[in-house]
Amino acid sequence: QKLKDAGADIYPIMSDASQTIESRFGNPDMYIAKIKEITEKEPILSISGAEPIGPKAYLDALAILPCTGNTAAKLANGITDTPVLMAAKAHMRNNKPLVISISTNDGLGMNLKNIGLLCNSKNIYFVPFGQDNYQAKPNSLVAHIDLLIPTLEMALEHKQYQPILKDYL
């Protein structure tokens, strides 16, 4: 909502999981309805719907939020088997910024290498992140979503917002 309030023209893209999995955070129908309400657009829900993002080049930047460990791993290894991953691949062919808002319980575990690969990739920028609960979940990393807008602004200048590592107090 804050992004829309700041004047952004948002094209929502949903992963297969977000379209189908009910969780403690809510159900897919609720999310789709809220996304339509905020963006005033139908979300992109398929790989074929996401592919034209490349040739049409209509996005200034693309943000993946939340970016799960699974999505980060697939992105780092060039796998494009969801609408979000196809959108990222298609968008990046235009040398425009991709902003990642990480949210994974495995960021300092098996996924650390994937986050490292993405941090070292051209045109990929991270919303600053930190350990949200280092005692109960020592490998968990979560982005500071309140820094999404300044991260996007810096990414549009092809700069990483700093510091990229930020404590949760």
Locations of regions flagged by a protein language model:
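A cross-family phosphate/adenosyl-ligand binding-site feature
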Residues: 1-82, 86-98, 105-169
